[in-house]
Design a protein with these regions (language model features):
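Alpha-helical interaction elements
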Residues: 122-123, 133, 184, 190-192
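Amphipathic alpha-helical transducer elements in NTP-driven molecular machines
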Residues: 100, 146-149, 153, 169-177, ...
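Phosphate-handling DNA/RNA-contact segment within nucleic-acid enzymes
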Residues: 15-155, 159, 173
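Acidic, metal-coordinating catalytic cores used for nucleic-acid/nucleotide bond scission
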Residues: 123, 144, 163-173, 191, ...
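Terminal amphipathic helices with adjacent charged low-complexity linkers/tails
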Residues: 3-6, 13
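Short secondary-structure boundary/capping segments
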Residues: 132-136, 176-179, 204-208
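C-terminal or mid-to-C-terminal helical accessory/interaction module adjacent to the motor/catalytic core
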Residues: 185-239
Length: 239
């Protein structure tokens, strides 16, 4: 599948030491496996794979080099699992504040369209690519950092925050706004219909329909915030 190759998606088997055994067989030292975050040490001193039993999403830097990984349990296993997603720990080569998921695959499209869509998760990015919208990156649920904004600003000054239409999505759209403004970015906000995230919405619509929805519903940040404050005050001018 093209999208699997494009994002270098993988799967770590349900054997919780498969990578450990294969890596050590090939001569990789215990310290290296721990330091890179691929494995962790148990109390008894044995090693366990960090991402066992998960779909793997590699984090690529702007040059396409792998810096770290995200791992997600499959839907059938999410019940009772405390962490649906796990990520590589910070290391000498992976600093989450400086990276954006999908930036390598998106950079040429961002320049071409002079705009970037910011979403929350890995699957949001991938679903939008499948829908034909490629100028999209994710900050994976963390607050935007100055480093991430400056990275985006190398390619465009225009950003649309694209999030779920529920309360959590509204809060997410407000995070990092001040920093975006301080870095001179032009901001628009688009909240999807309640109950949809970019992943589910992209699965229901083709690229043309999705782009038309964005065009019809994205709002300038000032207008978006004013409307939000009006709703919160229930149109009471005193509030």
């Amino acid at each position: 599948d093209d999208i699997v190759k494009k994002f270098q998606l993988g799967y770590s088997t349900s054997a919780n030491d498969a990578l450990v055994k294969e890596a050590q067989k090939k001569g990789y030292k215990k310290e290296f496996l721990i330091k890179t975050g691929l494995c962790y040490e148990k109390e008894d001193g044995s090693l366990r794979d960090r991402f066992w039993g998960r779909v793997i999403f590699p984090w690529l830097n702007i040059s396409g080099k792998v810096l770290g990984f995200g791992g997600r349990v499959l839907d059938s296993r999410t019940k009772g699992v405390s962490q649906k997603y796990i990520n590589s720990p910070e290391s000498e080569i992976y600093n989450k504040r400086k990276e954006l998921y999908g930036i390598f695959q998106a950079k040429s499209s961002i320049v071409k369209n002079d705009c970037v869509y910011m979403v929350e998760g890995y699957t949001d990015v991938i679903a939008m690519h499948q829908c034909g919208l490629e100028n999209v990156v994710a900050n994976s649920g963390t607050a935007l950092s100055e480093e991430q904004i400056r990275l985006l600003h190398r390619f465009t000054s225009n950003i649309t925050l694209l999030y779920d239409g529920d309360e959590a999505g509204i809060k997410a759209s407000m995070r990092g706004i001040d920093m975006l403004l301080a870095e001179g970015m032009n901001i628009k906000v688009l909240l999807l219909p309640d109950g949809d995230d970019p992943d589910s919405f992209a699965r229901k619509h083709n690229a043309t329909a999705f782009q038309q929805y964005i065009k019809d519903h994205e709002e300038d940040f000032i207008r978006f915030k004013a409307n939000l404050l009006l709703k919160e005050s229930q149109n009471d001018p005193i509030k």
